[in-house]
């Protein structure tokens, strides 16, 4: 379920905090006497309905595990005193500077964010050696949700696909234009959906700061299956910008729309992975009657192989598909609840 406390808000000072275009995410200082996490406490405060509430790490009760990855575990927790349910990303800091950078990047992006299409940040704590990033809890990731849909012999209707597209592109546009950030790991598992029909983007651990007029170079950040051609093409010197997120979005939408990943998954053969992306035609939605022409063209625009022909996320928001469908009635709330209820019953 979404957070039991729907009126949670960030502290006023965080809402008013000026956005920084000069944030530097670098290797933490080597001074062994000072850790980047030394200033974290075992509690934090947030404002809701005019009251300031305090969350203490020891008071949290774990409900279940929501996910697990290379950088830690995400748990659904409950705070009895405030009757608040949250998602907590629990990470054990190491001497690995890359993992430390990832954790700090995730934290700083969430702290600076004030976007309805990005998971809300409540606070951060340090307990028993673990950093605990407390966030809004959603019901399910889209990689799991679309599998539930197709397992039930249902289809993803275009009003649902519209909501997903509109939400994710708005999140990416906000990151790009307001925070100067490239997400770099856009995929269905980092898109979350709730019973209220809201779709939000999460996981900014490998996001990259993009200064005005600059391009990024790191190729190792993100899942290779969703990477844009320019991110893995050796002839481009691995230079890329916000348009690489657009490509990853397009690949994700084909997967969510059809229930199948558009490329063959060669789990151990890196060369075959790259060959598919670089030398095959860009994937496209099937012309089999399931999808409208405007939606198929919308996804096709996101998957232009030539980066100069591909729009940035904010530019793709102006597409005909999103404009035409904007005022159409959506059944996404009923659809999501129906799928999740039937899945729970199974």
What residue spans do the PLM features occupy?
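Glycine-rich ATP phosphate-binding loop
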Residues: 73-93
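Conserved N-lobe beta3->alphaC-helix segment of eukaryotic protein kinase catalytic domains
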Residues: 90-113
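A short, aromatic-enriched beta-strand patch in the conserved N-lobe beta-sheet
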Residues: 123-124
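Conserved short submotifs of the Hanks-type protein kinase catalytic core
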Residues: 129-141
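Activation segment signature within eukaryotic-like protein kinase domains
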Residues: 164-165
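Catalytic-loop of the protein kinase fold
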Residues: 176-193
């Amino acid at each position: 379920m979404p957070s039991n406390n729907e009126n949670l808000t960030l502290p006023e000072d965080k809402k008013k905090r000026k956005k920084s275009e000069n944030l530097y995410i670098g290797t933490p200082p080597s001074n062994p006497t000072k850790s980047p996490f030394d200033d974290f406490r075992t509690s934090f405060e947030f404002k809701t309905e005019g009251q300031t509430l305090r969350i203490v790490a020891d008071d949290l009760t774990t409900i279940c595990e929501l996910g697990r990855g290379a950088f830690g575990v995400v748990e659904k927790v409950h705070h009895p005193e405030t009757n608040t349910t949250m998602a907590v990303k629990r990470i054990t800091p190491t001497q690995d500077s890359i993992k430390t950078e990832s954790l700090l990047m995730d934290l700083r992006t969430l702290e600076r964010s004030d976007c309805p299409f990005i998971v809300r940040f409540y606070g951060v704590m340090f307990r028993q050696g673990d950093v605990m990033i407390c966030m809004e809890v959603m019901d399910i990731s889209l990689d799991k949700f679309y599998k539930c849909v197709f397992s039930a012999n249902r289809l993803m209707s275009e009003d649902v696909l519209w909501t997903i597209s509109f939400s994710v592109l708005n999140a990416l546009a906000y990151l790009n234009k307001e925070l100067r950030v490239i997400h770099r790991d856009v995929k269905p598992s980092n898109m979350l959906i709730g019973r209220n029909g809201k779709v939000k983007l999460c996981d900014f651990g490998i996001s990259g700061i993009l200064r005005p007029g600059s391009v990024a170079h790191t190729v190792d950040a993100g899942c290779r299956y969703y990477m844009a051609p320019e991110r893995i093409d050796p002839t481009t010197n691995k230079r890329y910008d916000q348009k690489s997120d657009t490509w990853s979005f397009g690949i994700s939408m084909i997967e969510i729309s059809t229930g199948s990943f558009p490329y063959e998954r060669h789990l151990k053969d890196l060369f075959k992975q790259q060959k598919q992306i670089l030398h095959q035609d860009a994937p496209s939605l099937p012309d089999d009657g399931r999808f409208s022409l405007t939606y198929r063209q919308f996804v096709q625009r996101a998957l232009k192989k030539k980066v100069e022909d591909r729009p940035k996320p904010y530019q793709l928001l102006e597409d005909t598909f999103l404009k035409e469908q904007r005022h159409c009635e959506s059944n996404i709330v009923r659809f999501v609840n129906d799928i999740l209820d039937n899945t729970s019953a199974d």
